[in-house]
């Protein structure tokens, strides 16, 4: 574990801790705070916000999601931002009720037991998990797979 910093979300006043080794978005999820997001890969801009105070390192992201002009204007992507200071962030898109009532993110290990072609462009995947998963309507899952080359790929379903 690295240094621990505090993130304050404006205008709602929610605060949480972030380790310098994790992204702001991952830290929020770990502590049960649901923030707007989509791809978690810096491609979609759903987690775009304004950094009002503090310093972050931005991991690789698409300039379609965050243009150079956006970045120069103080905008960041929470899914690609690692804190190196206490942060104050201005949320651009949020639902205050969702922020306070979200379900903490849980991590499961699993093994792919079946992979089949359903149509020409849709595949079915069965995953055997190491623990039961309670599913709520509207919930989704992020699946991270490590390739034979050691690359990790995450997709949301």
Q: Predicted regions span which residues?
A:
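Iron-sulfur (Fe-S) cluster-binding segments and ferredoxin-like electron-carrier domains
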Residues: 8, 27-36, 46-95
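Well-ordered beta-strand positions in beta-sheet-rich domains
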Residues: 15-17, 76, 88, 109, ...
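Short, surface-exposed secondary-structure edge patches
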Residues: 36, 41, 130-134
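Preference for bulky hydrophobic residues occupying beta-strand positions
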Residues: 7, 16, 49, 89, ...
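Ferredoxin-reductase
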Residues: 100-157
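Iron-sulfur (Fe-S) cluster-binding modules
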Residues: 1-2, 74, 84-90, 95-106, ...
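A short, compositionally biased
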Residues: 1-5, 43-45, 83, 138
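N-terminal pre-ligand scaffold of iron-sulfur
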Residues: 1-36
């Amino acid at each position: 574990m690295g240094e621990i910093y505090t993130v304050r979300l404006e205008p709602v006043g929610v605060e949480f801790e972030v380790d310098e080794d994790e992204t702001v978005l991952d830290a929020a999820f770990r502590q049960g705070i649901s923030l707007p997001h989509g791809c978690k890969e810096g491609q979609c801009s759903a987690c775009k916000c304004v950094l009002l105070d503090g310093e972050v390192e931005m991991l690789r992201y698409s300039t379609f999601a965050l243009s150079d002009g956006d970045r120069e204007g103080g905008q960041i992507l929470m899914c690609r931002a690692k804190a190196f200071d206490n942060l104050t962030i201005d949320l651009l898109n949020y639902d205050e009720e969702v922020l306070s009532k979200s379900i903490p993110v849980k991590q499961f290990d699993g093994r792919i037991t079946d992979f089949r072609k359903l149509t020409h462009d849709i595949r079915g995947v069965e995953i055997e998990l190491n623990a039961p998963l309670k599913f709520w309507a509207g919930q989704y899952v992020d699946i991270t797979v490590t390739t034979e080359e050691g690359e990790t790929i995450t997709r949301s379903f």
